């Protein structure tokens, strides 16, 4: 009798995706982050659902409702901090997942990559709106500053901002709609993630060498199921260490003060995972220019397939581009640091130099190094 998992319409889909899926035998731990992101998303949806049961999206009661969750709800503090720090884990996995894709040339799977870029934008939008919900000082002023950037759009800017606000400032209407969008977006992200997987399974996984691995495939289960479970356990260990011992380490103390439109915090800054983009935004003195640079800093990922000049896919055998890649990583860390610093003398110029080098490495130096490496390998006649 044929196995039910191979014949049943529903089980068949699961079987072809997670059990009998042929996978390259040499993929490293850098390929674990896809499954970790799936787990992160599930944790965020579940904890978020329980938080939504007790949260009220009204300017008068939002801050109090979050306090109520932490003090009065059974394990409310645990749910709240798992959700807040879960977002940080989500972004750590996301950045490592994208970094892996850049290093090993996974962006040559165009459809998968573009859905991935779309997912990145969706997750960033969700995280931004989620940060506004506790209605602390940094929530309010972060929302004000970031939404205000849209006013830089010529002609329709001001009208657009007032339309998003639902009034003439960030107020009750803004908070309510942000809660609505923050609730619905994770489900859209889940749907996009399924499409992401669908496109990936059309081509099969890439591998560290960047070479065709059709001759050497192994089944996903048990080899990669057990490997993924190990990754998940390690991630939960890190997450729960954060949640139980350092729950506020990645947060901002200003957000423990209720939102006050009459009092601006000394340094308005977003959560740590947006600091690199915030630094790029601030490094350009012109408002519209800054907004364009901010969007381009993420959208540049969509250009990666067109900037690939080498005849080799992966950076595994490309030492010059490898050096540039790690300089880019260091550069992003510098941008993250600068984003959290005040707008003062040494930081302004460091931020501007880091922003210039960020775009230069991706748009100019990496494509050139690809051509040079091909010449060195005499791949061109």
Swiss-Prot record:
GO terms for biological process: mitochondrial electron transport, ubiquinol to cytochrome c. GO terms for cellular component: mitochondrial inner membrane; respiratory chain complex III. Its cofactor is heme b. Heme b b566 binds at residues 97, 196. Gene3D superfamilies: Cytochrome Bc1 Complex, Chain C. The chain crosses the membrane at residues 33-53, 77-98, 113-133, 178-198, 226-246, 288-308, 320-340, 347-367. The keyword rRNA processing does not apply. A ubiquinone binds at residue 201. Binds 2 heme b groups non-covalently. It holds the Pfam family Cytochrom_B_C. Heme b b562 binds at residues 83, 182. It is found in: Mitochondrion inner membrane. Keywords: Electron transport, Heme, Iron, Membrane, Metal-binding, Mitochondrion, Mitochondrion inner membrane, Respiratory chain, Transmembrane, Transmembrane helix, Transport, Ubiquinone. It is a multi-pass membrane protein. GO terms for molecular function: metal ion binding; ubiquinol-cytochrome-c reductase activity. Belongs to the cytochrome b family. Component of the ubiquinol-cytochrome c reductase complex (complex III or cytochrome b-c1 complex) that is part of the mitochondrial respiratory chain. The b-c1 complex mediates electron transfer from ubiquinol to cytochrome c. Contributes to the generation of a proton gradient across the mitochondrial membrane that is then used for ATP synthesis. Heme 1 (or BL or b562) is low-potential and absorbs at about 562 nm, and heme 2 (or BH or b566) is high-potential and absorbs at about 566 nm. This is Cytochrome b. It comes from Mus poschiavinus. The gene is MT-CYB.
């Amino acid at each position: 009798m044929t196995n039910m998992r191979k014949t049943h319409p529903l089980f068949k889909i699961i079987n072809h995706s997670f059990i009998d899926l042929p996978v390259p035998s040499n993929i490293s731990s850098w390929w674990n982050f896809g499954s970790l992101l799936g787990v992160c998303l599930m944790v965020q949806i579940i904890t978020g659902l329980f938080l939504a049961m007790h949260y009220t999206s009204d300017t008068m009661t939002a801050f109090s409702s979050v306090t109520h969750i932490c003090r009065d709800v059974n394990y409310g503090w645990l749910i709240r901090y798992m959700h807040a720090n879960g977002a940080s884990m989500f972004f750590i996995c996301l950045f490592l997942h994208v970094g892996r894709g850049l290093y090993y040339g996974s962006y040559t799977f165009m459809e998968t990559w573009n859905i991935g870029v779309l997912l990145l934008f969706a997750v960033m939008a969700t995280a931004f709106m989620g940060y506004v919900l506790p209605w602390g000082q940094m929530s309010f002023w972060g929302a004000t500053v970031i939404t205000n950037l849209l006013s830089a759009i010529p002609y329709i800017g001001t009208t657009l901002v007032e339309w998003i606000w639902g009034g003439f400032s960030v107020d009750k209407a803004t908070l309510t709609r942000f809660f609505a969008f923050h609730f619905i977006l994770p489900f859209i992200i889940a749907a996009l993630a399924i499409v992401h997987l669908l496109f990936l399974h059309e081509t099969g996984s890439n591998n560290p060498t960047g070479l065709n691995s059709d001759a050497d495939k192994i089944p996903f289960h048990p080899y990669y199921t057990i490997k993924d479970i190990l990754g998940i356990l390690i991630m939960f260990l890190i997450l729960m260490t954060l949640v139980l011992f350092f729950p506020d380490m990645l947060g901002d103390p200003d957000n423990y003060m209720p939102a006050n439109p009459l009092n601006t915090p000394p340094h308005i800054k977003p959560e740590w995972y947006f600091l690199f983009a915030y630094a790029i935004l601030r490094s350009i003195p012109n408002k519209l220019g800054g907004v364009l640079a901010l969007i381009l800093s993420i959208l540049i990922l969509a250009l990666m397939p067109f900037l690939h000049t080498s005849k080799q896919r992966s950076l595994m055998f490309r030492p010059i581009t490898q050096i540039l890649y790690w300089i880019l990583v260091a550069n992003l860390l510098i941008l993250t640091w600068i984003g959290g610093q005040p707008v003062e003398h040494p930081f302004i110029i460091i931020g501007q130099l880091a922003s210039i080098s960020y775009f230069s490495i991706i748009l100019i130096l990496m494509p050139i190094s690809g051509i040079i490496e091909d010449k060195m390998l005499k791949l061109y006649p």
